[in-house]
Amino acid sequence: MLRPLLAAALLAVLALPVGASGSPIVPQLTATVTAKSITLVGADGKRVRVLQPNTYKIVVRDRTKAQNFHLVGPRVNRKTKIAAKTTRTWLLYLQPGSYSYLSDRNKGLSGAFIVAGSPPA
């Protein structure tokens, strides 16, 4: 009875994508905030519009003390401080749903994306 369970667990682990170091690959997104713009891009440099449910490494580059980066969505509510220039790295699981990112000081600086589909196998 234990053998089939162990075999299934081993297959699940082997099915995970891995990098050269042998650890699972975590997709990276980069958020950048300046005094006049806010963006969220994928590894390809293109603005994020649709993502699969997954764990993402989000590097937030807050380049101004005048704005901040605030990400809101299902079970997500993370932000940088307004009065600080900073670079932060967040490891977040993004589940299906609608997400928005904005500056709390200037609502005109905003963007949105959706997470849809099935998590990667």
What are the language-model segments listed below?
Residues S23-G42, I82-A121:
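Extracellular/periplasmic metallocenter environments
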Residues N68-R75:
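Short, surface-exposed beta-strand/strand-loop-strand elements in extracellular ectodomains
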Residues A43-K46, N77:
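Surface-exposed, proline-enriched loop/turn segments that connect beta strands in immunoglobulin-like
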Residues R47-A66, T89-S103:
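Beta-strand cores of secreted/periplasmic/IMS beta-sandwich domains, seen most often
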Residues L16-P24:
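Bacterial Sec-dependent signal peptides at the C-terminal "C-region" and cleavage site
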